[in-house]
Every structure is written in structure tokens, then in C-alpha cells.
Amino acid sequence: MGKYERIKLFILIFTLSLISLIVIMINGKTFDLNININDNVKNIEDMEIATGSDNVIKITQKNYSNGILHLKIKSNHKGCSFVEVSSKGHYSINRIFVHEFGIITLDRRLGKCTGDIVVPISILIIITYLLSIKIKHYKKNIEYSSYQYSNISSLGLILFLSSMLVNQIIQISRYNGFAHSIDFLLESVDVFSKNMFPIVILNFILVTVSHFKLLKKEGITWKNMLGVILGFAIIIPSVFPNLVYSFFNNLLHLSLYNEKSIYYHIYLLLKLFSYSIVSYFECILISTVILAYKSATRIPKFDKDYIIILGCMIKKDGTLTPILKNRADRAIEFAKMQREANGKDIIFVPSGGKGMDEIISEGEAIKNYLLEQGISEDKILVENKSKNTYQNIKFSNELIKKRNSNSNIAFSTTNYHVFRAGIIATKQNVKVEGIGAKTKSYFWINAFIREFIATLYSEKKKIIKVFVLITIISMIIVSLSFISAI
């Protein structure tokens, strides 16, 4: 968010806060209390209506129709009182709080008051504004390049804000005071965690099973263990509030059912914080899957002059491994699609140096395969010095620029590698579009998780800001809940 947008956000929050304060101060000195009465009561004279003897409030108007008693209440001075109604088959009592400036709230210190619907509506406007800014930034970044970790973090935040927006709309439709909104939020978080936990467990099982296949094929390494580690990292915060509950309730023998207890609100804070963080991280993980899958399945525009084939390990006899063969075949397939679409030919750039245990360079091995597939040598430009993806892009781009400084470039790699390779190209200001070759599913899952962790690292400053904001909001919400329960 830029400086200008932060200023606009501050002005919006200040303006809405001021409007909310004015609306509540103008309307909050009176309150319309509606009480459902037994149908056997025919008229208001059959009821006994009483208030506290301290003259904190007074009833200025009474009306009874269709089984509902309507009372108009006005504040006299600060304090706490009640409205007691009794009749044949009916008894009710409502606590009334009168605050500074004569503002009346019902039942709880932060209960419903006249005009307070403006508060959740203001929050809805702020969330909508933040969401619109993030969508605008996301679209702008996507237009520049699809391959950026900032796109993942932005989409994750868009998903998170969207869920908040839906939750806020539901709150407004059911609004019954600020305190009840807090209860609804805490209940929503609880329901969300219970609904998501089976999904988290299922994902953990699927990731673990797929990683056993990967470990069997590739061996045990930290990179190959990422999925299992991440599974535990998501499960632990999901069950953490339950562990805290057991600690307070079973070991310390402290009741968490008393809403006035400080321990109850510590538990609420930990639950709200844990589940909010987990839901935010899940939104980032979902956005990682969406963008990585979109990148891998996307077909580049048919305007390409060159297509780089990213190298990887070759066989001992100098022929291509199945993975590298798939990359070359995908490049050939794209060249055919482009030729059929507009007649434009493409130059292949097989890229990859010679490893210590390889008899020829990966670039030369790919070239040999292309020749076998009927590609003419004048359509092949070999890059044979690179040792990694960064150098694949860098050295290939340098060769291309020597021939034509204004070329449209594509690259072919394994589908799970498209997004990461695209990011490496973007960091070098090389404008490219990737196309993905198929591979085993267990490579996909590990790649998604690797990109998720890379996003957390690359966008750590933004994520820490969201982390701090969630912490502050959680503390404010639980503090207000505690104040309201006193």
C-alpha cells in the first residue's frame, strides 16, 4: 500500500469513526426496548413494569400490540439500572447501562444501543476499501508479470479479506449489538476451525502419502520433507487452543465457562489469534496452488521468437532423462501449435552446462534430441555454460539479445517448475512466458509447498505486518469482550 493510499485509508477510518460517534451520540440517549409477551395478556394494564429506584433511566412511552411490548427509554444520568416486566405467565428483566453522554446499552456494557448499526457498516466499508486496493494492486502486478511471490501474498490477503467481508455482511444481517458481534466473531472462528480441521487432517495424510512416494524415489532430504513438516506446522496451531483448554481446565482446575473470568478471555485470545493466523496461512497456501497451477497449465501467446528449454540431469550415455525429454517435447509441441496458429517459426534454445558426471552438456544433449525429432539445425541456438536455472535464463537471454534485442521469449520446463523459473526470470527483468511439461503428482505437491515457504520468506515483511495486525485486532476484540462481560 502506497503512501497516498495509507493517507486515504486514515482519512476514511477517521471520517467513519467521527460519523459513528456523532450518530450514536445523537440517537443513543434513547432506546426502543421490544419485549415478547405471553399471548394471554390482552392489554398493557395487565402488566407490571418497573425500573430501578436510582432514577438512572425513565420510561417515556409504552405501547402494546400483537404480543409485543414497546418501551421508549430515556437516560437521566450515568449508571446501571433495569427494566422489569411481569404479567400472567410472563416475567423478564433487562439490564440497562447508561454511559458517558447518556448513551444507553442493553444487557451488557457494550450491548446494543440506538444507532450503533453504523459501526459494523463502517467496518464493512473499511474492509471493502482494503479489498479493492489489494485487487487493484494484484491486477497491476499480474499485468507486469505472472511470476512474482508478491502475487501469491496479495491473492492470499484478498482471499482472507473476502472471508472477512462475507463474515461482516452476515454480522450486519444478524446484528444485535457490538457485544453480540464479538460473540458471533468468536463463534465463527470456532466453527471455521472445526470445519477446517478434518480438511487439514486429510491434506496432511495426502501430503504424507505423496511424500513417502517422493522419499522412496528421491531419498530423505530437507526439501523432500517440507510437506510433512508443513502438515505438522498447520495442525499444531489448529489444536493449540484445545491444549490450552485442557491445561487450564484439567491441570490448573480453572473453569473456562465463566465469561467474567480472566482465564476465559486468555483462552479466547489464544483461540482467536491461532485460528486467524492458521486461516491466513491457509489462504496463502491456496493462492500458491492457484497461481502455480495457473502458470503450469497456461499456454503462452503465439508470438514467440525463441523458446528456452531448461536443462536438467541427463543419462550417462548422453541421452535425455524422461523429465528432460518431456520438456523438449513440450517445446516442440508449442512450436507446432504456434506454426499452425499463425505460420510463425520459433528458434529453440536448449540450455544447460556439463555436469561433472555427464559426458556432454545438457544443452548439446537436448540439441541432439531436437535433431532426431526433425528440427533443423538453423532453428537451434545452444547455451551450454549454465549450472542452474538462474544461469539458464541469464545466459540464454544474452545469446538471444546478440541476435535480436527485441524478441518475444518462452521457456519450457516441468510443470511444477514453471512458476519458480518465471520468478527467477522476473528478478532478472527478463520478460518470458512459461509452458509446463507433465510429471508425477508427488512432485507437484512438494513444489507447491516449496513455493509456499518461499513466499513466506520473500514476503516476510508484509506477512509480519499482517501478523502484527491480527495480534492487535485479537487483543482489542477480546479486551472489549472482557469489558462487556464485567
Can you annotate each of these PLM segments?
Residues 39-65:
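Short, solvent-exposed loop/linker segments at beta-strand-coil boundaries, enriched for Pro/Gly
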Residues 33-39:
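A short, amphipathic beta-strand motif
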Residues 88-93:
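Short, exposed coil/turn segments at beta-strand boundaries within extracellular/luminal domains
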Residues 72-74, 414:
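Extracytoplasmic loops/domains of multi-pass membrane proteins
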Residues 289-290, 296-447:
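A structural signal for short, hydrophobic/glycine-enriched beta-strand patches
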Residues 67-71:
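Short strand-edge motifs at loop-to-beta-strand transitions and within beta-strands
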Residues 65, 75-83:
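Glycine-centered tight-turn and secondary-structure capping sites
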Residues 2-32, 97-301, 402-408, 412-486:
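Extended hydrophobic blocks
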